[in-house]
């Protein structure tokens, strides 16, 4: 598991938070995330790699119905709750 400082550094990025918001609801393909968030698929892949390294998301290989190489679909790996009290 990622320590608190690493988790906060990962979550400070708005695009990563938007990705997680969608993955909490249901697994998504990178192209779906790119279309919903309004950033390139390449940028989504960069953020997914960071989220995967931080153990926020997991990648699953899904076979295609009509042949071809399998596709990757991403889902939230674990629940996370951060509560910060000031004062």
Predicted regions and their residues:
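Short, Lys/Arg-enriched N-terminal segment that forms or immediately precedes the first helix
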Residues: 1-9
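Short helix-coil-helix linker/hinge
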Residues: 9-16
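Short capping segments at the starts of secondary-structure elements
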Residues: 14, 25-32
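Alpha-helical residues within the helix-turn-helix
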Residues: 35, 52-53
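Key DNA-contact positions within bacterial/archaeal DNA-binding proteins
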Residues: 42
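Beta-hairpin "wing" of winged helix-turn-helix
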Residues: 54-68
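Conserved segment of winged-helix/HTH DNA-binding domains
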Residues: 65-87
């Amino acid at each position: 598991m990622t320590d608190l400082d690493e988790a906060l550094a990962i979550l400070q990025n708005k695009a990563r938070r938007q990705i997680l918001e969608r993955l909490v609801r249901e697994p998504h393909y990178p192209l779906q995330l790119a279309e919903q968030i309004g950033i390139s698929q390449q940028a989504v892949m960069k953020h997914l790699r960071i989220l995967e390294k931080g153990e926020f998301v997991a990648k699953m290989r899904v076979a295609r119905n009509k042949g071809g190489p399998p596709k990757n679909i991403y889902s939230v790996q674990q629940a996370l709750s951060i509560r910060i009290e000031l004062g």
